[in-house]
């Protein structure tokens, strides 16, 4: 149950934890593979891209790269918010996807410098202004992932609305 200081979208937010372990020890095929086990008990594999110039540094491309999981997390966070905002407003939303494209700095630490999020929202009688407001609320107020990434990246959005 929300306390008086929580907004409707906020979950109980306590500390999060995760253990990330390298899977590339002696006798394994993996070079730069990692497995993350989240505090909620889920497992996520990550791997690096092959590096032809420095084979010992590269991965085997067997799982998403760590920065891809960061980008995917931001997409999941904002899509979650948009669907929840629209559903709570009793709008007939039937689908939501977001395609993210990004640019990164050329030099270390190679942070994201630009991220574009192209939303495709499907529903009945949805008004673009309503969906755009839900997207803006997510980016400006609720989505901790995009708000953090916005400290280094210019984040832009687009919307394709599909009537069913």
Placement of each model-derived feature along the sequence:
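Extended beta-strand/beta-hairpin segments
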Residues: 1-72, 83-164
């Amino acid at each position: 149950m929300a306390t008086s200081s929580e907004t409707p979208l906020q979950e109980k937010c306590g500390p999060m934890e995760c253990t990330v372990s390298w899977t590339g020890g002696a006798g394994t095929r993996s070079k730069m593979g990692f497995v993350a086990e989240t505090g909620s008990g889920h497992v996520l594999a990550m791997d690096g891209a092959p590096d032809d110039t420095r084979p010992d540094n590269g991965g085997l491309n067997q799982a998403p790269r760590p920065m891809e999981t960061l980008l995917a997390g931001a997409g999941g966070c904002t899509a979650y918010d948009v669907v929840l905002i629209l559903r709570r407003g009793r709008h007939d939303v039937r689908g939501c996807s977001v395609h993210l494209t990004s640019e990164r700095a050329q030099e270390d630490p190679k942070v994201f410098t630009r991220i574009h999020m192209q939303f495709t929202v499907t529903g009945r009688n949805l008004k673009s202004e309503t969906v755009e407001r839900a997207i803006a609320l997510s980016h400006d107020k609720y989505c901790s992932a995009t708000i953090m990434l916005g400290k280094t990246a210019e984040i832009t959005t687009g919307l394709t609305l599909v009537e069913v």
